[in-house]
């Protein structure tokens, strides 16, 4: 089990009204829990759960259109909001084959992001109806299963 509490702020002249603001690396809470269990000499399983506070982001508060192009309007304060918190569970199981004179093999079955959490990778803002901006969250991965065979000689 690992836990980290960490804050990261920046002050840059001309940004955020010259006031301190959250840096992109400000993720106060990071938790990692890893469990490994060896059922026998030939079979083991593991679980890994990760949680991080969402990354800071600056949301626009309006938009305007000029010559057919739409632009976002920001209030001047940087990183006042956050992405949704990030978390996922990964599972893995490994079966080792019997040792032969010259080599040994093992099968591994893994599942990344077991419960299919849609962790935000990026946020896009698109023009919506009634002169509004719509927020679209982009996700990289959902559940990813894998099977592999490894051998040593």
Positions of predicted regions on the chain:
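Extracellular loop and loop/strand-boundary signature of outer-membrane beta-barrel proteins
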Residues: 16-22, 76-80, 132-137
């Amino acid at each position: 089990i690992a836990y980290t509490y960490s804050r990261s702020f920046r002050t840059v002249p001309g940004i955020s009204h010259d006031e301190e603001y959250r840096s992109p690396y400000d993720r106060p809470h990071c938790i990692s829990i890893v469990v490994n269990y060896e059922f026998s000499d030939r079979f083991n399983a593991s679980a890994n759960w990760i949680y991080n506070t969402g990354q800071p982001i600056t949301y626009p508060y309006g938009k305007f259109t000029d010559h057919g192009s739409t632009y976002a309007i920001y209030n001047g304060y940087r990183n006042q909001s956050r992405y949704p918190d990030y978390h996922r569970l990964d599972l893995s199981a490994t079966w080792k084959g019997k040792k032969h004179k010259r080599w040994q093999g093992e099968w591994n079955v893994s599942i990344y992001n077991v419960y299919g959490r849609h962790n935000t990778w990026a946020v896009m803002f698109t023009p919506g109806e009634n002169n509004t901006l719509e927020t679209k969250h982009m996700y990289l991965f959902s559940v990813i299963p894998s099977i592999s065979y490894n051998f040593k000689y």
